[in-house]
């Protein structure tokens, strides 16, 4: 294949270059070979797939340094000051095999909550949708008919945080008076006893990963009271209390390698060993409250054993024994994680983000500046290659997920951007704003794909189902909206 490309170039008398394919980790593929300078990504794809000898050709993207080859190699080289006398390294990146299409219309406007909708979350397979509200209830919605399913009463204050277990069989909800309740989405009934112990409101909930424990027994909570607690949901008791933060803990992540990460208004992020609660290290660098953080492996941890490329039109529960689910989740996690340890990105009231490798080092990999106001949310794309951050400065910014390098600003909202969600194929991003709209962004083109007005007031919460079929949003108008293509 490489020889055929070279022969064709000779026939056309085009300038030629010596190139070498390598993967993102620097692993060489084949030997250097000769290509015409005007070679297109389609031709590179043919050659690269021939060298990879895959049964099914992979969709690939190609990069010279950080610049993607969009129309031809020559055009990309013109925009980069690249030395073409030597062998030119071309990095290939496998892309998602399936494609998520942008949602374009609101298919349902679901009323039922009597106060603002504070959080919305699809279950790991996209079968269920849950919402938490200022009216003290959690609601489950039937996605096949797009109608209310169950109203769950038990909290006595605003429901601030909800989180699905990675097997999709339980939802944890935390409220303003510090209590945590567990719910069964198939019945709408409370599971086990109320988990009480925090003295102030719950700021975050995070489950132990499926590949670590397929029974999904443990959930961690963070609170305004400055502590993190690990709960045994089967026994209904607090297993461990992690103390050390001097102010409110704002968010929490249970990583895939046995570490828990907590971020706080004391400007630090603490890294804990989940199985015994030992503090491993404290990450310092932010000049103000740390509001938000995300892991490069978040999508694999959220979806566990669910593979979106194999999803059916009507989402189902996960099938298989606990051991099979554990093995599937572990292989998906390892594939996502790659060679290095998971990366963490944090966003702060000081307008900056930091990229960390928290399992290895307490110093940040890089500091990311550019936002003009505090950062509300930060998220890695499902393939972990891009970080998106949403801010009170009305913009969303995109950053390289490995280096932290600034890539682009997505502008269009006319007020604060509260929350963002990625499509499963990492090609699209949806944002919800104080300006009452949702917007869908094409990440590669770095432009607006779809403007979605419809809410009557601020949009606080947005989520994209893991199978890519639906977006759900909620906010101050008490209405939950479902959007489809």
From Swiss-Prot:
Its main location: nucleus. Keywords: Acetylation, Notch signaling pathway, Nucleus, Phosphoprotein, Repeat, WD repeat. One of its GO terms (biological process) is ribosomal large subunit assembly. Residues 14-96 are annotated as: Ubiquitin-like (UBL) domain. The keyword Phosphoprotein applies. SUPFAM superfamilies: WD40 repeat-like (SSF50978). The keyword Acetylation applies. The modification Phosphoserine is found at residue 79. It comes from the Eukaryota. Plays a role in regulating Notch activity. Plays a role in regulating the expression of CDKN1A and several members of the Wnt pathway, probably via its effects on Notch activity. Required during embryogenesis for inner mass cell survival. Associates with the pre-60S ribosomal particle. Interacts (via WD repeats) with uL18. Interacts (via UBL domain) with MDN1 (via VWFA/MIDAS domain). This is Notchless protein homolog 1. It comes from Pongo abelii.
């Amino acid at each position: 294949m490489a020889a055929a490309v070279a022969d064709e170039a000779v026939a056309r008398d085009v300038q030629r270059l010596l190139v070498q394919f390598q993967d993102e980790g620097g692993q060489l593929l084949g030997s250097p070979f000769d290509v015409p300078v005007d070679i297109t990504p389609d031709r590179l794809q043919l050659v690269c797939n021939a060298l990879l000898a895959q049964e099914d050709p992979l969709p690939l993207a190609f990069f010279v340094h950080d610049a993607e080859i969009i129309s031809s190699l020559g055009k990309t080289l013109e925009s980069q000051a690249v030395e073409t006398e030597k062998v030119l390294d071309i990095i290939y990146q496998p892309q998602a095999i399936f494609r998520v299409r942008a949602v374009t219309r609101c298919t349902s406007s679901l009323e039922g909550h009597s106060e603002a909708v504070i959080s919305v979350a699809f279950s790991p397979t996209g079968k269920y949708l849950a919402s938490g509200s200022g009216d003290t209830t959690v609601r489950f919605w039937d996605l096949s008919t797009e109608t209310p399913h169950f109203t769950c009463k038990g909290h006595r204050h605003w429901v601030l945080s909800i989180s699905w277990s990675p097997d999709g069989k339980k939802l944890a909800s935390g409220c303003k008076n510090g209590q945590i309740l567990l719910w069964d989405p198939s019945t709408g009934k409370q599971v086990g006893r109320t988990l009480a112990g925090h003295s102030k409101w719950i700021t975050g909930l995070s489950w132990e990963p499926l590949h670590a424990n397929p029974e999904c027994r443990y959930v961690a909570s963070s609170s305004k009271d400055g502590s993190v607690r690990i709960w045994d949901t089967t026994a209904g008791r607090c297993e461990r209390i992690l103390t050390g933060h001097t102010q409110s803990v704002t968010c929490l992540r249970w990583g895939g390698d046995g570490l828990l990460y907590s971020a706080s208004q004391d400007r630090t992020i603490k890294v804990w060993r989940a199985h015994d609660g030992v503090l491993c290290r404290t990450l310092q660098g932010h000049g103000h409250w740390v509001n938000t953080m995300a892991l490069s492996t978040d999508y694999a941890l959220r979806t566990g054993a669910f593979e979106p490329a194999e999803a059916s039109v009507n989402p189902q529960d996960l099938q298989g024994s606990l051991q099979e689910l554990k093995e599937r989740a572990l292989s998906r996690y390892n594939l996502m994680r790659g060679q290095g340890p998971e990366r963490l990105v944090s966003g702060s009231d000081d307008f900056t983000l930091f990229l960390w490798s928290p399992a290895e080092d307490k110093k940040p990999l890089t500091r990311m500046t550019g936002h003009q106001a505090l950062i509300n949310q930060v998220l890695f794309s499902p393939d972990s290659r891009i970080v998106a951050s949403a801010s009170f400065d009305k913009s969303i910014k995109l950053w390289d997920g490995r280096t932290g390098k600034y890539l682009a600003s997505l502008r269009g909202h006319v007020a604060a951007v509260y929350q963002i969600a990625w499509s499963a194929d990492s090609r699209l991003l949806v944002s919800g704003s104080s300006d009452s709209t949702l917007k869908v962004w094409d990440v590669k083109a770095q432009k607006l794909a779809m403007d979605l007005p419809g809410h009557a007031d601020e949009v606080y919460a947005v989520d994209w189902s893991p199978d890519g079929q639906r977006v759900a949003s909620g906010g101050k108008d008490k209405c939950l909206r479902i959007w489809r293509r």
